[in-house]
């Protein structure tokens, strides 16, 4: 029996599946534990020995659908449901 190239063809079962917390394919099915974020533990798994890896998955590297708009909404005090007042037509034409 060989333990090298020939044996790799036998590997057909997935040991990891998608994690519901971090979304990565790091959730170990038999252990029921995510290797990336340590789900279902309450504290998220982060180590400082891999600074570059933290930089890859930190806030701002994804879509940020909500957080992207927060600074703009903060300027107006998070007001919603109001309409802009109509501008004076005379001021716009003379300027």
UniProtKB/Swiss-Prot annotation:
GO biological process, one term: translation
UniProt binding sites for Zn(2+): 19, 22, 34, 37
One Gene Ontology CC term in the entry: cytosolic ribosome
Cofactor: Zn(2+)
Cofactor comment: Binds 1 zinc ion per subunit.
Gene Ontology molecular functions: mRNA binding; rRNA binding; structural constituent of ribosome; zinc ion binding
Record's keyword terms, sorted: Metal-binding, Ribonucleoprotein, Ribosomal protein, RNA-binding, rRNA-binding, Zinc, Zinc-finger
Zinc finger region(s), C4-type: 19-37
Annotated InterPro entries: Ribosomal_eL37, Ribosomal_eL37/eL43, Ribosomal_eL37_CS, Ribosomal_zn-bd
PANTHER family xref list: 60S RIBOSOMAL PROTEIN L37, LARGE RIBOSOMAL SUBUNIT PROTEIN EL37X-RELATED
Record family assignment: Belongs to the eukaryotic ribosomal protein eL37 family.
Record function comment: Binds to the 23S rRNA.
Protein name, UniProt field: Large ribosomal subunit protein eL37y
Organism: Arabidopsis thaliana
Taxonomic lineage of the native organism: Eukaryota, Viridiplantae, Streptophyta, Embryophyta, Tracheophyta
